[in-house]
């Protein structure tokens, strides 16, 4: 399915400081890996930001109908965490600008591109035009249910979505069979530390 979702969980806190949990979740004995809260889980959240575009390189005439692209923050550790496979170019790192993007094959095909590196798609808002330049392409991965059509998706540096990151999640992996134990430990942290916040805690395999 193009991405890792087995033994993968994620937790977010609204009205609570998730940053305080980074080290605590990573230190849980059943957790094998945890990423800092700079990202959103592919499942079930997906993109928290969408843009409408109607123009991209090699388009013969500007399309009447606009395409919706989901924009997700991501850096090397995110691509590695989910096992997303790079087909060409590079993944997003700190040397990239906020408008550098990695897209998947499906988005590349929708633009009619055989080769996407260095090409751009354009977003217009209030008469201002922004260009997003493709620096990498990853293999398709299915993050929606098998019956629904895959969305168009682009990954960009988290600095481009800073205003959303107070809602970001800690993504983590846990030992085989340890989900219930893991969930209980995180629920206890929640009750002890942020009882008035709203917690979202998911096992990505169960949500798919």
Outline where the language-model segments fall:
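Membrane-proximal extracellular/periplasmic loop immediately following the first transmembrane helix
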Residues: 1-60, 65
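"Rare, low-scoring activations can occur
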Residues: 16-36, 105-106, 128-208
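Short, well-structured beta-strand/strand-turn elements
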Residues: 32-35, 85-90
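A short, compositionally biased
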Residues: 45-48, 113-119, 165
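The feature marks short, hydrophobic/small-residue-biased sequence motifs that occur predominantly
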Residues: 50-88, 135-136
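Beta-strand-rich non-transmembrane domains
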Residues: 64-70, 89-102, 121-140, 162-164
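Short, solvent-exposed hinge/capping segments at secondary-structure junctions
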Residues: 74-88, 102-119
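Activation segment
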Residues: 82-83, 96, 111-112, 125, ...
